């Protein structure tokens, strides 16, 4: 009996570079979550491609959907984003707050801010976003109002400092959300000498111990800390 010829299997789509950054979610599970995501619009898709090509870490669509869902859940109208890069998550926030909402973008790289501005215009959300090119902690420290959501994705060594600024600038019932809190599993290394790992460990401990917040870490991607102000 003649043997059938082996069929060529479809080539599996390779992961974009931004999906490799600090990945905690198990590979097969991450692939499954990614396969379930609805197709993004052309601007978001282009931002994902740009981030992959230029090795710019972004939260990616799986986490971005969580961020947007959380904002919608509390009917957030004001978001302060710390560490916005090219503005990928900023666009998701802008869609969540709606036409009358406001998102503050912060990033220390003027080139990132310029690129983000162009993306915002093309995405039709530029009128909802205020851009600040500079140190996110300094910009936050200058704010007099209380926000519905504060999203923290700055340099990891600064995480403990960020926490000290949050309580007076977040409304009761507001959300303080922080990315990368599982740090590719390195938080399990209690005796780590790495400065970033130690800063995240301290931040997580302080956040859970804080009487101002009720905190849960979601083990999606690289770990997302969601703290509600009480």
Role assignments for model-derived ranges:
Residues 44-50, 183:
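Short, basic/glycine-rich phosphate-binding loops at helix/coil junctions
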Residues 61-230:
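S-adenosylmethionine/decaboxylated-SAM
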Residues 50-54, 187-190:
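Short glycine/proline- and acidic residue-enriched helix-loop micro-motifs
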Residues 35-39, 52-66, 72:
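Conserved SAM-binding loop and adjacent beta-strand
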Residues 1-41:
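N-terminal auxiliary segments of SAM/dcSAM-dependent transferases
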């Amino acid at each position: 009996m003649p043997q059938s010829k082996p069929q060529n299997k479809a080539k599996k789509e390779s992961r974009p570079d931004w999906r490799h950054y600090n990945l905690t979610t198990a590979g097969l599970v991450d692939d499954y979550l990614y396969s379930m995501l609805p197709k993004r619009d052309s601007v978001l898709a282009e931002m994902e491609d740009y981030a992959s090509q230029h090795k710019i870490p972004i939260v990616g669509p799986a986490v971005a959907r969580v961020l947007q869902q959380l904002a919608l859940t509390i009917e957030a109208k004001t978001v302060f984003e710390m560490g916005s890069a090219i503005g990928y998550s900023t666009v998701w926030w802008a869609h969540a707050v709606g036409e009358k909402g406001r998102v503050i973008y912060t990033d220390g790289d003027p080139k990132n801010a310029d690129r983000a501005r162009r993306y915002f215009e093309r995405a039709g959300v530029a009128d909802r976003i205020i851009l600040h090119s500079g140190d996110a902690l300094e910009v936050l420290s200058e704010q007099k109002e209380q926000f519905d959501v504060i999203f923290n994705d700055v340099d990891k060594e600064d995480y403990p400092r960020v926490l000290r600024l949050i309580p007076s600038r977040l409304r009761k019932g507001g959300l303080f959300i922080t990315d990368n809190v599982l740090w590719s599993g390195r938080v399990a290394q209690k005796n780590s000498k790495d400065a970033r790992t130690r800063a995240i460990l301290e931040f997580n401990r302080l956040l859970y111990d804080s009487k101002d917040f009720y905190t849960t870490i979601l083990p999606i991607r690289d770990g997302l800390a969601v703290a509600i102000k009480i």
